[in-house]
Swiss-Prot record:
Protein's name according to its UniProt entry: Killer cell lectin-like receptor subfamily B member 1A
Extracellular side: 67-227
One annotated GO molecular function: carbohydrate binding
Localisation per UniProt entry: Membrane
Keyword Transmembrane helix: yes
Coiled coil feature spans: none
One cellular component term from this protein's GO annotations in UniProt: plasma membrane
Membrane topology: Single-pass type II membrane protein
Organism: Mus musculus (Mouse)
Tissue specificity statement from the Swiss-Prot or TrEMBL entry: Expressed in natural killer cells.
Length: 227
């Protein structure tokens, strides 16, 4: 009896990684663009950005040019308003019953009272007791006052403990404008009487002279005031 021959087809053993083989790779130049194409793409992007920036700049320039006439018109209107304001300031006048001299208005009271009451009355009129600027202004007031026999308080007072004459704005008396040579007593206030300036007790009853300015000026501009 012939022995049966059995042949087994032997297959080589599979390695562990053989079950997960990677797909075959594509050719190197299958999905790559030529270098010249990439350069053209970059240049196109740069050109597009430059175009957008240029359009934005032109739109801003057009807007400025459109608004320029309006800005110039506003400037002209502002200048006209400033000129009108200047003209109005030049036409300011003193209130009725006030004396006008240079850039000041003066009011002579019709009643008599103490120096302090005169100060309060002037303040209620939006003014102050008279502050003499120079000899010319003093001469104008002396010539304008008809009642030569009366005394009129002004904004000058003898202060303690300084023992000095001071205007109500705090500046000291300038002797080039006014000179008070008499011995001064405590609690003395200055008054215009006749053709000179005298001093009396601040509690005396006198009329007074108020002043206000037509234009805004700082009191430091007055040469009649010391510092």
């Amino acid at each position: 009896m012939d022995t049966a021959r059995v042949y087994f087809g032997l297959k080589p053993p599979r390695t562990p990684g053989a079950w997960h083989e990677s797909p075959p790779s594509l050719p190197p130049d299958a999905c790559r663009c030529p270098r010249s194409h990439r350069l053209a793409l970059k240049l196109s992007c740069a050109g597009l950005i430059l175009l957008v920036v240029t359009l934005i700049g032109m739109s801003v320039l057009v807007r400025v040019l459109i608004q320029k006439p309006s800005i110039e018109k506003c400037y002209v209107l502002i200048q006209e308003n400033l000129n009108k304001t200047t003209d109005c300031s030049a036409k300011l006048e003193c209130p009725q019953d006030w004396l006008s001299h240079r850039d000041k208005c003066f009011h002579v009271s019709h009643v008599s009272n103490t120096w302090e009451e005169g100060l309060v009355d002037c303040d209620g009129k939006g003014a102050t007791l008279m502050l003499i600027q120079d000899q010319e202004e003093l001469r104008f007031l002396l010539d304008s006052i008809k009642e030569k026999y009366n005394s009129f308080w002004i904004g000058l007072r003898y202060t303690l403990p300084d023992m000095n004459w001071k205007w109500i704005n705090g500046s000291t008396l300038n002797s080039d404008v006014l000179k008070i040579t008499d011995d001064t007593e405590n609690d003395s206030c200055a008054a215009i009487s006749g053709d000179k300036v005298t001093f009396e007790s601040c509690n005396s009853d006198n009329r007074w002279i108020c002043q206000k300015e037509l234009y805004h000026e700082t009191l430091s501009n007055y040469v009649g005031y010391g510092h």
